[in-house]
A protein has these predicted regions:
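Interfacial loop-to-helix junctions that mark the boundaries of transmembrane helices
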Residues: 1-3
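Transmembrane helix-loop-helix hairpins at the membrane interface
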Residues: 5-119
């Protein structure tokens, strides 16, 4: 029961707390302001790079060995995901963060399962 309770708690955090908070901040606040200021192409790339940089900073705060592959994965995957979910929100979600939240929560769950197995 202890492991299942932990998995449930971690899953809820991945789905709601982390994904929702990051989507509200990065896509609901940062992306909207950068896109309004510099246009969709530049604003979306800028917010995606900031999103990727945050995830790289989180890696640097761990004791995981810092290989080039890890640096690239932890920077590039969130950067691409950040660009895609902002595009999804703006082009298909009428500006709502809900589509991005769903995509982000799914990515967090996949990562939550895959990273311990592959890292």
């Amino acid at each position: 029961a202890g492991v299942l309770a932990w998995l449930y708690t971690a899953g809820i955090q991945a789905l709601i707390t982390t994904a929702l908070a990051e989507e509200i901040f990065f896509r609901g606040f940062v992306a909207k302001r950068l896109i309004a200021w510099r246009g969709f192409a530049v604003g979306n790339i800028a917010q995606a790079l900031l999103f990727g940089a945050l995830h790289l900073a989180l890696l640097l705060g761990t004791n995981a060995p810092l290989t080039l592959a890890r640096w690239l994965l932890v920077l590039l995957i969130p950067t691409v995901q950040g660009w895609v979910v902002a595009w999804l929100n703006e082009r298909h979600g009428n500006g709502s963060v809900a589509p991005g939240w769903a995509a982000h929560a799914t990515a967090n769950l996949v990562t939550f399962i895959a990273v311990p197995l592959l890292w």
